[in-house]
Amino acid sequence: LDRLAQAPAGTLSGGQQKLLELARVLVAEPRVILLDEPAAGVNPALVDTLVEKIVELNRRGVTFLVIEHNMDLVMSLCNPILVMASGRLILEGDAERVRSDPRVIDAYLGDVAA
C-alpha cells in the first residue's frame, strides 16, 4: 500500500481497503482481532496477501477470531474451527474433523441423503 499512501481510502479496491483496515487496527497493537468476512469481495491475489499477513501476525502472538463462509479460507487459517448454525455451536475441532462431520455437512448442504 506504500504507493497508495496519499490516495483517499474510497478510491482503493476492496482488497486494498481490507489491507488498510487491518493496518489501521494494528496501530493499536491489539492482542485479539475480529475479522468479519475478510475475503468478501477481494481479488484472489489480494486474498493470498491478506492470508499471509494474518498468518504472520498470528505467529507473532496476535489472536484472530474469523467469521467467514469461505470454507477453504477457514480451513487454511483457523485452528480450532468452531462451526455455528442457527446461532448455536454445533462443532469445535480441527479442519479434518470439521470437513467430515455429518452435522456440519447437514448444516451447510442440507440432508444430502434425502
Protein language model regions, located:
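Conserved catalytic motifs of ABC-family nucleotide-binding domains
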Residues: 29
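Catalytic Walker B motif of ABC-type/P-loop ATPase nucleotide-binding domains
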Residues: 33-37
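Helical segment within the ABC ATPase nucleotide-binding domain
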Residues: 47-60
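Conserved ABC ATPase signature
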Residues: 8-12
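A short, surface-exposed alpha-helical micro-motif characterized by mixed small hydrophobic
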Residues: 74-76
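H-loop/switch region of ABC-family ATPase nucleotide-binding domains
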Residues: 68-69
